């Protein structure tokens, strides 16, 4: 990036540090099937995804399958972005692997239905990206990963999963057990802490809980992860318990205090 752009980020980091604060920068390899299909009009290019998935906004519009070569380039770019963030004095990087964006599309069998190539292994893209970032930033630089424990599409739609054309291919999403296994491997690859949510674009209301849902509605989700790591004795790369961040209507100090004291999250 241009020197002027880098200096802007460095100035922002120093301003935050002046108040005793720390901040992470969120990195994403892209939107994939949930990106607006303006690329077709503006660049005469089809949108892309892990497999031949339908575009979220225009289901009749197919997304082209990214080649292994292009995915490897994306991983290298993520490593460079993380190295740039460290050079700008930003305190850590935060990978967005939730809500059905491209990182989730590559690491969830609902969207990644590849049969050939190294990224037919649905865990590999995410693990390779974390390893590349860790290689570029060194051992003492935090990597945070935002993930959903489940897409919860089958729970949301039930029998409609077989009836709605735009949902049919997404029935075999990552199970909770598979997600926990993936998270274990992410820790081994270099992730230091997690932000755990639930849902995706195709059940948009769920990861953005409406007024009718109670405060702290997803604390059981973060507790599942906390208990799993504790039971298996999984420690972060810093040798401490893996911190787990909770989400879901936590704008209430009393609810947050109980959650922290009760061990639901960190």
PLM features per residue range, with description:
Residues 1-266:
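Flavin-dependent oxidoreductase catalytic cores
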């Amino acid at each position: 990036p241009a020197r002027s752009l880098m200096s802007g980020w460095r100035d922002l980091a120093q301003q935050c540090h002046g108040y005793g604060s720390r901040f992470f920068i969120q990195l994403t390899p892209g939107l994939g099937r949930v990106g607006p299909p303006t690329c077709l009009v503006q660049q005469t290019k089809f949108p892309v995804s892990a497999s031949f998935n339908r575009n979220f906004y225009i289901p009749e519009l197919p997304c082209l399958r990214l080649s292994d070569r292009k995915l490897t380039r994306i991983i290298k770019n993520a490593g460079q972005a993380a190295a740039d963030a460290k050079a700008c004095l930003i305190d850590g990087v935060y990978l967005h692997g939730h809500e059905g964006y491209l990182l989730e599309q590559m690491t969830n069998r609902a969207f990644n239905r590849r049969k050939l190539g190294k990224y037919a292994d649905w865990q590999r893209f995410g693990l390779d990206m974390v390893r590349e970032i860790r290689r570029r930033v060194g051992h003492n630089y935090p990597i945070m990963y935002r993930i959903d424990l489940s897409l919860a599409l089958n729970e949301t739609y039930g029998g409609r999963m077989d009836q709605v054309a735009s949902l049919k291919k997404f029935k075999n999403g990552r199970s909770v057990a598979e997600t926990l296994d993936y998270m274990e491997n992410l820790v081994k690859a270099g992730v230091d802490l997690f932000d755990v949510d639930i849902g995706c674009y195709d059940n948009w209301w769920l990861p953005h809980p409406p007024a009718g849902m109670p405060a702290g509605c997803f604390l059981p989700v973060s507790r599942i992860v906390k208990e799993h790591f504790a039971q298996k004795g999984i420690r972060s790369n810093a040798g401490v318990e893996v911190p787990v961040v909770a989400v879901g209507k936590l704008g209430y100090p009393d609810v947050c205090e109980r959650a922290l004291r009760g061990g639901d999250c960190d």
